Design a protein with these regions (language model features):
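Extracellular/periplasmic periplasmic-binding protein-like sensory domains
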Residues: 182-186, 287-361, 435-448
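Signal peptide-proximal N-terminal region
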Residues: 90-112, 239-241
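Extracytoplasmic "Venus flytrap"
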Residues: 52-93, 117-122, 220-227, 351-357
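Segments of small-molecule ligand-sensing domains
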Residues: 348-356, 367-430
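Beta-alpha junction/loop-to-helix N-cap segments that form part of ligand/metal-binding clefts
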Residues: 53-56, 83-87, 103-176, 250-256
Length: 449
């Protein structure tokens, strides 16, 4: 089985609203175990007289009972929309609520400090200042923001940022930042390798191998960032041998019916896009109206939600052709104990999503790190050291194995695994095979964020 970690997604401003399908993927890492140094130092040094050990009445230091503060930054009121960035926050908060109900970490309650940065760089810096410098949080968890302008300040303060969503390039740029999918980049202050990041083609390989897809369409707006992202998707598809059909619509007055008619004419097997959620719903409706049936209308983890029936209510055929891909276990896979625990704790939420599950996994990751530090003291440095040692972390099976390793050169190929689900009315998101066995050896393609 190929283990892997995932680096930042393709980074363009539109990534927050359309499917980032040429995801940056990286291989597993193996870090030095800092605990060995501690063990060696304990075995060296001056020898004490035996009498010093005969009557040791010393008591251990009193256990700290003060709450552990963690921060969650989410662009809850961003221009993109009120719920676009709140899934990871809600999942993480649900984890901490359940954790506190069970006694917290080593008897200490976790105090969650929330901050909405409004989707702006100024707001993000204000949140970082409040949480890192004023509230003195031990760590940030499940960061999900449109503009991570304060990332360098978080890194400079050596505050571990655990399980954040790689909407920007920060998680492939700075030390002490640990994205939910991992990273192989040097993370020395320069993005990726000499300013370039790398994405791989496992999504395209999957549909070619498993479903015989040969023709893929990519739909974008006539807007620079949308078009740039579409070109990246097209490049990945061509690398996998697809015939690529490009479709562009006017951002202000999109004619989705014309696009749908051409998709039917061209015989597209797959449809990828660089458009927003509302545009996707209108595209699907147009596809149903003209009878453009496809093997898969492919979306990503951000749109892997229970709101599909409402969002695509006017397009039943296209709705049932929706497929989602990602790096975490399907949030409807209640046959898995870790998913059952997540669903039980979040049953009060109106909707469920893959981003909620990944936020839950991020909070669990922090908890595992903090528990490892309980004996010596739960500090930023100790939690950060645990994260640096992370090797194949899965959050109890919720994630594909995640690791961090600073490679001097980018890998040319990777062994990459994939979680896949498709929507079916009456069943919801139905998993397609074992994510730990749906693996491919694929090329890495360079891009500039």
């Amino acid at each position: 089985m190929g283990r892997r970690s995932r680096a930042a997604e393709i980074q363009v401003p539109w990534q927050a609203t359309f499917a980032p399908l040429l995801a940056g993927r990286t291989l597993p890492a193996r870090a030095l175990a800092a605990v060995l140094l501690l063990a060696l130092s304990a075995a060296c040094g001056s020898r004490l007289p035996e009498s010093d050990f005969e009557h040791d009445d010393r008591t251990p230091p009193p256990r700290d009972s003060a709450p552990l503060r963690v921060g969650i930054i989410a662009s809850a009121t961003s221009p993109v929309g009120g719920s676009a960035f709140t899934g990871p926050r809600d999942g993480a908060k649900a984890w901490f609520d359940r954790l506190n109900a069970r006694g917290g970490i080593d008897g200490r309650r976790v105090e969650v400090r929330l901050c909405d940065d409004g989707g702006s760089g100024v707001g993000n810096n204000e949140c970082v200042h409040q949480l890192v410098e004023e509230d003195e949080v031990v760590a940030l968890v499940a960061t999900t923001v449109l503009d991570y302008a304060g990332a360098s300040r978080v890194s400079g303060a050596r505050v571990p940022d655990i399980g954040g969503q790689p909407i920007g390039s920060a998680y492939d740029t700075y030390p002490h930042l640990y994205g939910i999918y991992g990273s192989l980049a040097p993370r020395d202050g320069t993005t990726g390798w000499d300013g370039k990041q790398y994405g791989s083609t496992e999504v395209y390989r999957y549909f070619k191998r498993e479903h015989g897809a040969r023709t893929a369409a990519v739909v974008s707006y006539n807007q620079s960032a949308s078009a740039a992202y579409a070109r990246l998707v097209e490049r990945g598809l061509r690398a996998e041998g697809y015939r690529v059909v490009t479709e562009q619509v006017d951002f202000a007055l999109p004619n989705f019916r014309a696009v749908a008619a051409d998709l039917k004419e061209q015989g597209a097997d797959l449809v990828f896009d660089a458009i927003d959620g509302h545009g996707n719903a209108r595209l699907c409706q147009a596809m149903d109206e003209v009878g453009a049936d496809v093997t898969a209308k492919v979306t990503n983890v951000q749109n892997w939600t229970s709101t599909v029936p409402e969002a695509y209510r006017d397009s039943p055929r296209c709705r049932n052709a929706l497929w989602a891909t990602g790096s975490s276990r399907n949030h409807q896979d209640t046959g898995h104990p870790a998913v059952r625990e997540f669903r039980d704790a979040t049953k009060g939420l109106k909707t469920h999503s893959q981003w909620q599950l990944e936020g839950w996994a991020a909070a669990r990751w922090f908890t595992d790190a903090a528990k490892s530090c309980a004996r010596t003291g739960i500090t930023r440095a100790c939690v950060d050291a645990y994260m640096n040692r992370s090797e194949g972390y899965t959050a109890g099976g919720l994630l594909l194995p995640v690791e961090f390793k600073r490679l001097a050169e980018p890998p040319k190929t990777t062994r990459t695994c994939l979680s896949v689900a498709r929507w079916q009315d009456g069943k919801g998101w139905v998993g397609q095979g074992d994510m730990n066995r749906t693996c491919f050896d694929v090329p890495q393609l360079a891009y500039e964020p």
